[in-house]
Amino acid sequence: MRGFIGGLVMGLVIGVVLAVTAPGSKISSSPGNAGQPVAKLANSNNIEKPVKWKLASAFPSEMPLSGSLGLTMIDRLKEISSGKIEVEFHEPGALVPTLDLFEAVASGTVDAGLASSQFWGEKSAAFELFGAVPFGPDIASHLAWFRHHGGQKLYEELYHRNNIHSLICGVTGAAGAGWFDHPIKELKDLKDLKIAATGLAARVYRYIGATTVNLAPADILAALKKKQVDGVAFSTPAADEFLKLNEYAKHYYFPGWFQQAGFIDLMINLTKWEGLSKSQQKTIETACMANMDYSLAAGEAGQFDALKNIVIRGVDVKKFPPKITLALKRAWLKVARTRASANKDFRRVLNSLKNFREDYSIWQELGKI
């Protein structure tokens, strides 16, 4: 570590000297946001027309954060735009089946959707890396990578290929590892189970021998009640409590190996996005930024109360034995290598995030207690 830092400092000094003394060297006068991804904007001289959109949500409106953020965003938009941007919230399945939401937004069948990109792994493997990353970064570093180190550019490229413009419109923190109807003491206890899971969590659970089922959030409790699944890997304690998973599974495990941070996406039909004025686009971006700020604080603030309620209801809350967590990490590394070898987009996103985390870890080791 010290040797590395010494070399890093020396390299920076030499680089600065060479840059200053090189012939024709110039100091860039580019604005601070140069190089940042900029969405294709409509002609700002266009006459603004009132916007009235329908939004289909993958999450129930009463679900803490994941769902309620949709209503919060809609209220913000109406207030900021003085009523000129109106979005009508529709509960999961009301307009289209939740797992068909991607196609519905891409085609313009619905104007916008609220979901997690981990649902869209069959569209592109790389989408799953924006939803939840196994053994991944916390919220702060995940946002740092996304906003300032290439993540947003890759994210927008993926969505734009599919005629969707997407904005991060909320964040979630660490998830639980899973709910099960019996204790999990050994890795073999996970094998042959049927687990409701999506994204990369599902791929890792399948790698170790479990079977997974991709369910819309609103369908998870019914599947658990009918014993169609033996376990559930979903989200944060607050969201899990809302689904009432404790009624049919009494063993809740941590840590959240498959999600330390998650993004909630506002997907907008790209043609309709480009038809907005620059001012209207900025209004939507501003509302989503405010949503992110709110969800970051409120999400962390609400988790202990949710855990307390879960324990009161008789759930056994504990951590996986370290050997299980280690086995899951090894499985993830193998899954990641396989996915990266098979898919260029997955490889680009994974390498971008990996390179950032390697550099960021030096700052973490030096600066954080």
How does the language model describe each region?
Residues 140-156:
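A gly/proline- and charged-residue-enriched helix-loop-helix capping module
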